[in-house]
Swiss-Prot record:
The keyword Phosphoprotein does not apply. This is Large ribosomal subunit protein bL20. Pfam families: Ribosomal_L20. GO terms for cellular component: ribonucleoprotein complex; ribosome. The gene is rplT. One of its GO terms (biological process) is translation. Keywords: Ribonucleoprotein, Ribosomal protein, RNA-binding, rRNA-binding. It comes from the Bacteria.
Length: 116
């Protein structure tokens, strides 16, 4: 069986890693071994943080809705309970957007929830 030297395959693999490491500082973008470590770390962090992003935004929306609800005399938990009782199905993202962009409309939603 003929010998396989893998020159092209190895070069292609290393070029791919160095291309992914473009923009990293110093040897992290120049030397294959350190670049490979940094690319692996970056991909791991990106994978983790794509999931964390969803949690972070939900927390942000809840904080914003809670702050706006307290200005209108309700806590966040009471507001969500009242909204559920009033059959108002506005998600946290939309409530937070209303609270920031249009506080009067948010106040009206709170009043409807209070009356339920």
């Amino acid at each position: 069986m003929p010998r396989v030297k893998r020159g092209n395959v190895a070069r292609k693999r290393r070029k791919k890693i160095l291309k992914l490491a473009k923009g990293f500082r110093g040897s992290h973008s120049k030397l294959f071994r350190t670049a490979n470590q940094q690319v692996m770390k970056a991909l791991r962090n990106a994978y983790r943080d794509r999931r964390k992003k969803k949690r972070d935004f939900r927390r942000l929306w809840i904080v914003r809705v809670n702050a706006a609800a307290r200005l209108n005399g309700l806590s966040y938990s009471k507001l969500t309970h009242q909204l559920k009782k009033a059959n108002i199905e506005i998600n946290r993202k939309m409530l937070a957007e209303l609270a920031v962009v249009d506080p009067q409309a948010f106040a009206q939603v709170v009043e409807v929830a209070k009356s339920a």
